[in-house]
Amino acid sequence: MSAMMALTLGGVMTSCNDFDDINNNPLTTGGDKIKPYYSLLSSIKGAQMDPYLGERLFVIEWAAAARQDGEDGYGVSIGTKNDEYYGAAFSYNANWMRDANTCINLIEEPQGTWTAHEKDFYPNLKQMARIWRVQMMAQFVDNFGPAPLNGFQGVNPEFSSEKDVYYWMLAELADAVSNINTEVAPNDDEKKNDPVFAFDAAKWKNYGISLRMRLAMRLSEADPAKAKSEFEAAVAQGSGIKTVDGTAAVQEYDGWSDWSGPMSRSWDIQSMSATSFLIA
């Protein structure tokens, strides 16, 4: 066989080995590339509020009414109200709950093969996502009232009462906290995808405990017996957040994105006059 013939056959055989790749869409991803924590990151990122929602809820509404914004003359400070802002908040908040829920679903129904590390880490990640989902749901029910407990299943869900949602959230936190393994550590890539605690299991556990205490206290007038029992049960699970370094906080950055804080953007200095808001 000539050298040219051997080279040609080698090229054909190589091409045949790669032929199946033509059926793989380069714009899609397979289960082995889907990391559940990407969805949790999407929820955390969105909850920081992009300039559209952040400006309307914080600056035009809260900051103007609280006289924390020097640009007076709009929003509730002059007695006007725009339902568009609250409609947007409803939609945004639903998306944050959806993304946290997706993280949980991807762990409960794996899309690919897990590594030995992922088999240890993902059960913890599920509990962290459950805690964050409760945080998002608490914001939703406190702002809009009844909320669905069986949402994001592809059908229109039924909305449950505030009482039922609160009872569910408290039970969810208790179970999630009890199932966190503080001995499991994330790898470097996983750490980078959690801007709150870098997937530190102990910090997430304390966060869940403190959130349970907070929600219990919100029931202190409406349901004092439940508030007392849940708060005491939360204390029995651990210390909760007691130090500054355990605080749930996300770093803000300048610019026009979810990461730019609504009260600290360089292009919106919100300067205040020394005399504009004096009361005679």
Which residues does each predicted region cover?
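Membrane-proximal, proline-rich intrinsically disordered regions
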Residues: 16-75, 84, 109, 113
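Conserved, well-structured interaction surfaces
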Residues: 69-188
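C-terminal motif of bacterial Sec signal peptides marking the signal peptidase cleavage site
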Residues: 11-15
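Bacterial N-terminal signal peptides that target proteins for export
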Residues: 1-3
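Extended ligand-binding clefts on enzyme/binding-domain cores
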Residues: 33-34, 232-280
